[in-house]
Amino acid sequence: MSSDDTVKQEHSCSADSEKQDSSCASDNEQPKEPQSPRNIHGLLWVVTILAIYSSTFLFALDNTIVANIQPAIISSLNGIEKLAWSGVAFVMASSATVLTWLQIFNQFNIKWMYIFSIAVFMGGSAICGAAQSMDMLIGGRVICGIGGVGQYVGVMNFLPRLTTMQERPMYVSAMGLTWGAGTVLGPIIGGAFTDSSAGWRWSFYINLVVGGLFAPVYIFLLPSLEPQPAGTTVSSRLKRMDLVGTLILFAAFAAGVIGINFAGAMYPWSEPGIIVAITLGGVLFIVFGIQQTYCILTTEETRLFPVELVSWRQPLLSLLFVCGCCTGVCVTVPTYVIPLYFQFTEGDESLQSGVRLLPFVCLLVFSCVSGGYLAGRLGYYIPWYIMGGGFCLIGSALMYTIKPSSGPGATYGYSSLIGLGSGMYLQLGHAVAQAKVKPEKVPAAVAFTTTAQLNGLTFALVLSQCVFVNEAAKRIGWILPHEPRSTIVDAISGTGSTFVQELPTATQNEVLGAIVTAIDRTYILCIVAAAVTLLATLGMKWERLFIEAAAAA
């Protein structure tokens, strides 16, 4: 054997030995925890995440804070014909601008756009608190809705960048806890301010206090995240935004919501203006869909809606969108109508009627936190949609049977089932969608699931008010055929409650029964939403998504 062959053999043996040692070493090593993507830890991280969640809480709070304080607002500002807009203006503005905010956060510095959205929200809150007319209040609510949803999208952009894949379901569910808690605590907090010496204006001023408290955290602790390469000009960033789609979508929401909101309450359904508004809204939504699908005056990269996530071959994201809309419905309807039920049947004041939501709130918060934690630990997501949809369906069907004589216990128990079910998948879709897409598509997934939830909330509020007002007015009209419709609408809106109290006892009981029946009808929306959720699970897979995604990462 030559010296060269000897060297080669020794080298080969040495290499084999190294490989064997390396293999043994790797077998003995424990799997490493995923490296944290954030550079703040410990107490500073706790303070930072609390500050982030506080903005989500305030946004959710403003969704429903006017639910049971509208009579006090009307008493101060007048303008009964614009009553419903104190709530609808906020959710309409949020739904119409959520996709635009997503593009803004995808083009500009995330930290400073987040702070800008908070400033817009605080400005709108100041206008609402200082409002001297209903028009001023409605304008402030629109500004609040635009800024509030910007905060929400900002949080959904921060969390994926500051948490690991394994942590994410827990943090997203914790955000769901704050969002759900804010949504259902809105009537309680609003009622507390209204019934106290502070008055209803502090329902809006409180946002300024909380925002000011956490302002140093936003400015000094939040990391500066730049989504675009350094040196990218403002003009080039704006060119990557779909301004045409933004205008079409906002106009579609405005027309559709105006038509549905005013129909029956202010004008008959046959009114030409109502027909035109509803028709125009529908046409504009179709135009928006065509413009986005075929990239008219936009491109595949810059279009507003993430059409690429909608696929027949991989339907999971589309099913998550549907379930997101459904959970928005199941949270919104009880939040608005349970206080209304107790105001009419028990004569509750604003605060007391809001407190009646606590069983619903507690179960929603519990299931949201526990569901998010267990989904992250176990990896499966489909069981939470099945159980959540089932509980919502049972609870909603039982709430449909409520009568004036049912008593508080039945309402507490039945609504708790809805809270338990809706909490199970309230925020789960955000984590699932982000885990199913490539890293560069995470912002689009955020837009997709956030849009679903806000759309469900918006149309649940608009449609439930429409169903309640029209059903109650129709049934009371049968009982009191000689009363003007405007008087009846005022009474069922909460601004003319003395009208009901002054009726003879027998007639009063009939009217009360008609009102409760109208409230029951709103739960048809929840029944349908829960049933659709269960149907959607038929297209989902049993997969350990979060564990697999974390391993791949």
Swiss-Prot record:
The UniProt record lists the keyword Repressor: no
Biological process, per Gene Ontology: transmembrane transport
Induction: Expression is controlled by the asperlin biosynthesis cluster-specific transcription factor alnR.
Location, primary (coarse class): membrane
Alphabetical list of InterPro entries matching this protein: MFS (IPR011701), MFS_dom (IPR020846), MFS_trans_sf (IPR036259)
Domain of life: Eukaryota
GO molecular function, one term: transmembrane transporter activity
Record function comment: Efflux pump; part of the gene cluster that mediates the biosynthesis of asperlin, a polyketide showing anti-inflammatory, antitumor and antibiotic activities. Is probably involved in the efflux of asperlin.
Family: Belongs to the major facilitator superfamily. TCR/Tet family.
Name of the protein: Efflux pump alnA
Gene transcribed to yield this protein: alnE
